[in-house]
């Protein structure tokens, strides 16, 4: 297995047609913000997620998704990660490029949020759309055990705010979560 990281349009253009089994795409979410991942204020990763219009954003995605379709094998599949901001646009683009009949499933990635918002409900999930290039797609079922404590642990761990006012888990001097 090979994982490629970078501007997927530039990478996709170098890939032979009908040669890829699976694509996982995590595009910008149309947040209209600069996204930064940092550790102690040292920026480790940053990208612009700002657009002049939703049409520009949709064109950005469409060009890339057309290339994804080109490089997928006939038995290939694509998973596209998005959130509530543009998921309805992305679903229509995917239907247009791959065909609505190639939609296989929608995965809901649910996560816990503690709501203290005065403006309404906070988002607590993201979407991953699963499309195939044809009806002859490959899908290998893998069964694993679920952790019976995953959600309980998330609920029980104490939280605090960091210097950027983000909620983080409290840890002791050894780096262990405090329950």
Q: Residue locations for each model-derived region?
A:
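Core catalytic lobe of class I
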Residues: 1-179
């Amino acid at each position: 297995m090979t994982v490629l990281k970078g501007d997927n349009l530039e990478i996709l253009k170098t890939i032979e047609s009908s040669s890829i089994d699976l694509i996982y795409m995590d595009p910008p979410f149309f947040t209209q913000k600069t996204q930064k991942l940092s550790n102690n204020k040292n920026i480790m990763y940053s990208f612009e997620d700002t657009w002049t219009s939703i049409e520009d954003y949709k064109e950005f995605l469409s060009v890339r998704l057309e290339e994804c379709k080109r490089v997928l094998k006939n038995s290939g599949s694509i998973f596209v990660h998005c959130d509530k901001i543009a998921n309805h646009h992305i679903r229509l683009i995917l239907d247009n490029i791959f065909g609505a009949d190639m939609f296989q499933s929608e995965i809901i990635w649910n996560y816990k949020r503690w709501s203290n918002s005065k403006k309404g409900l906070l988002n607590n999930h993201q979407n991953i759309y699963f499309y195939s290039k044809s009806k002859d797609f490959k899908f290998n079922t893998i069964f694993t055990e679920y952790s019976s404590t995953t959600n309980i642990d998330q609920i029980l761990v104490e939280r605090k705010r960091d210097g950027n006012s983000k909620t983080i888990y409290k840890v002791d001097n050894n780096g262990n979560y405090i329950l």
